[in-house]
From Swiss-Prot:
InterPro entries: NTP_hydrolase-rel (IPR022970), P-loop_NTPase (IPR027417). Keywords: ATP-binding, Nucleotide-binding. Belongs to the UPF0200 family. ATP binds at G10, M11, P12, G13, A14, G15, K16, G17. The lineage of its organism: Archaea, Methanobacteriati, Methanobacteriota, Methanomada group, Methanobacteria. This is UPF0200 protein MTH_434. One of its GO terms (molecular function) is ATP binding. Gene3D superfamilies: P-loop containing nucleotide triphosphate hydrolases.
Length: 190
C-alpha cells in the first residue's frame, strides 16, 4: 500500500475532531497540528493563539507543517490524517512531500460553532463571543479560508452527528482504497 496522507481543515468547532476520531477508528494515525501549537504554548507559558503567530514569525510559515512531516516520517503507519491545516503554505508542503495528498474541509456556521465550543470547553476555546470572533479572524489571517475553498472534499456539518460520521467514513474509505490501488498500479479517477 502506498502511504495515504489526508488533511482535514475547518474553522474552530466545525467538526474536525469528529472526522479525526472516525479516521482513528479506521486505522489512520492522526496528527493534530493544534497539538504542536498547544505543546509549544505550554512550554512558553503563552496563549495558543499567540504561540501560533509567534512560531510562524520566528521559524517561517512552514514550521508547523514541517513538524507534522517529521512525525509522519518517524511513524511506521501507512495511513495518516493531519487535523487542523490552516494555510495554503501548509497544503503546499504536504502536497510536495506526499503525492496524492487530499484535503477534506468541514464547514459549520459561526452560530453552530460557537455553541459547540462553549460546550467543549477546551483550554483554547473562547467562552465569550468577542474572543470567538477574534479567534476566527486570526484563523482567517493564516489563510484557512483559501484552504477551505480549494479543498478536495467538503462536509457540511449542521445536522446530527451521524451525518458527519457517515460522510467522513465514505470519503476516508474512498481515499484509503485509492492508496491501495496506487500501490497495485491501479488508476486514480480524479
Amino acid at each position: 500500500m502506498n502511504m495515504v496522507v489526508i488533511g482535514v481543515t475547518g474553522m474552530p468547532g466545525a467538526g474536525k475532531g469528529v472526522v479525526s476520531r472516525i479516521a482513528e477508528s479506521m486505522g489512520f494515525r492522526v496528527i493534530r497540528m493544534g497539538d504542536v501549537i498547544r505543546d509549544e504554548a505550554r512550554k512558553r507559558g503563552e496563549d495558543p493563539g499567540v504561540t501560533a503567530v509567534r512560531l510562524r514569525e520566528e521559524y517561517g510559515k512552514y514550521v508547523v507543517a514541517e513538524k507534522c512531516v517529521e512525525r509522519i516520517q518517524e511513524s511506521e503507519s501507512e495511513m495518516f490524517l493531519i487535523e487542523g491545516i490552516r494555510s495554503p503554505h501548509e497544503v503546499e508542503i504536504f502536497r510536495k512531500r506526499f503525492p496524492g495528498f487530499r484535503v477534506i474541509s468541514v464547514f459549520s456556521t459561526r452560530k453552530t460553532r460557537f455553541r459547540r465550543l462553549r460546550k467543549r470547553q477546551r483550554e483554547d476555546d473562547s467562552q465569550r463571543y468577542a474572543e470567538f470572533v477574534e479567534r476566527d479572524e486570526r484563523e482567517l489571517g493564516f489563510g484557512i479560508g483559501d484552504v477551505i475553498a480549494t479543498s478536495d472534499y467538503m462536509i457540511v456539518n449542521e445536522g446530527p452527528i451521524w451525518k458527519i460520521k457517515k460522510q467522513a467514513k465514505q470519503i476516508l474509505r474512498k481515499l484509503a482504497e485509492k492508496g491501495e490501488e496506487s500501490s497495485r498500479g491501479g488508476q486514480e479517477d480524479g
